[in-house]
């Protein structure tokens, strides 16, 4: 059995190679990958192709007959999802065994355009290989978005070259709470970790090869204790701050009148958008107490200068980069 694709279509070729690799992993047999002219198919093969008549851009049709298997999609994405369905039809451990598939046709398309999962690596850091395994599981379940939560009170996990202390200081905490939030019990074990920009780009590429978009999250203006520990001048009180060993919501947030804070946001976003080609960057915006802003003369001066009257308007200013 071979796997064929339309010659010259590198994405279909990549899909074919992915499927061949999985079959090798599950069975020990490596199906050869062959390019065919547009419109051609091979007997006793798994043929991958495009079909403009399939309505949904991510939809596919998988047909199994005695002469072979055909997987068509309107786009290469759809073909990839069809490959995942075929993959799930093969026993996970079928070394040396004959695999029989029932004849039939599967027509499938997603109900939702956005299908994603979130992973918080701030409270609990995960190594690069785990991130790849996580993405593989997303692909297996036809997910197309990986929401990567990279910054929080408990750790800053992405390298920002203009602000090296974010990882030198902000990626490390002295210990971690044991049990419920603020239980008062700690493990007294130093904890840390971060991803270099090159590692993040590696993850973006790995995800793209599986038709998954990586949306980074840089949480602001709250959940910034790790950043404030590295650069205390960006807070209302000037610190000292520490990377939090606890879970929960904390009063210390970015000072909205501090020009250094605003410049910091612009600089960080400039580097983040160079790493991640996603149309979106998640900026959190949740759980930002206004306690410090209410007592900070600089923040109050800006609130009055902007003519803000409601708390939601204050929060909006805190999220803007000026």
Enumerate the language-model features and the residues they cover.
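Conserved, mostly hydrophobic/aromatic
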Residues: 23, 75, 117, 138, ...
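Active-site beta-loop-alpha junctions enriched in small/polar residues
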Residues: 122, 151-155, 219-223, 286-288
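Active-site mouth loops of central-metabolism enzymes
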Residues: 116-130, 253-260
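An active-site-proximal structural segment forming one wall of the substrate-binding cleft
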Residues: 141-146, 200-221, 252-284
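Aromatic- and acidic-residue-enriched carbohydrate-binding clefts of CAZyme catalytic domains
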Residues: 110, 154-209, 224-263, 292-311
């Amino acid at each position: 059995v071979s796997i064929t694709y339309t010659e010259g279509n590198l994405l279909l070729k990549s899909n074919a190679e992915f499927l061949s690799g999985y079959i090798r992993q599950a069975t020990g047999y490596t199906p050869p990958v062959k390019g065919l002219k547009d419109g051609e198919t091979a007997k006793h093969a798994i043929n991958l192709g495009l079909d403009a008549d399939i309505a949904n851009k991510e939809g596919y049709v998988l047909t199994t007959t005695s002469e072979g298997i055909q997987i068509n999609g309107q786009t290469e994405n759809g073909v990839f999802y069809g490959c995942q369905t075929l993959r799930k039809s093969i026993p996970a451990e079928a070394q040396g065994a004959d695999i029989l598939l029932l004849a039939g046709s599967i027509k499938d398309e997603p109900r939702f355009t956005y299908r994603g999962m979130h992973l918080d690596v701030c409270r609990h850091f995960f190594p690069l290989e785990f991130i790849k395994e996580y993405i593989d599981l997303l692909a297996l379940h036809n997910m197309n978005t990986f929401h990567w939560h990279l910054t929080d009170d408990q750790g800053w996990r992405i390298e920002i070259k203009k602000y090296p202390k974010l990882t030198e200081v902000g990626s490390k905490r002295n210990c971690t709470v044991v049990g419920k939030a603020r239980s008062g019990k700690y493990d007294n074990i130093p904890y840390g970790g971060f991803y270099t920009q090159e590692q993040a780009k590696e993850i973006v590429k790995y995800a793209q090869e599986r038709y998954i978009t990586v949306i980074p999250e840089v949480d602001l203006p709250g959940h910034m204790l790790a950043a404030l520990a590295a650069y205390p001048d960006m807070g209302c009180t000037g610190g000292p701050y520490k990377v939090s060993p606890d879970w929960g919501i904390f009063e210390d947030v970015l000072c909205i009148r501090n020009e250094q804070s605003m410049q910091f946001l612009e600089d960080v976003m400039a580097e983040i958008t160079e790493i991640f080609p996603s149309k979106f960057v998640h900026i959190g915006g949740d759980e930002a107490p206004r306690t410090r802003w209410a007592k900070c003369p600089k923040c109050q001066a800006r609130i009055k200068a902007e003519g803000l009257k409601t708390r939601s308007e204050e929060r909006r200013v805190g999220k803007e980069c000026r």
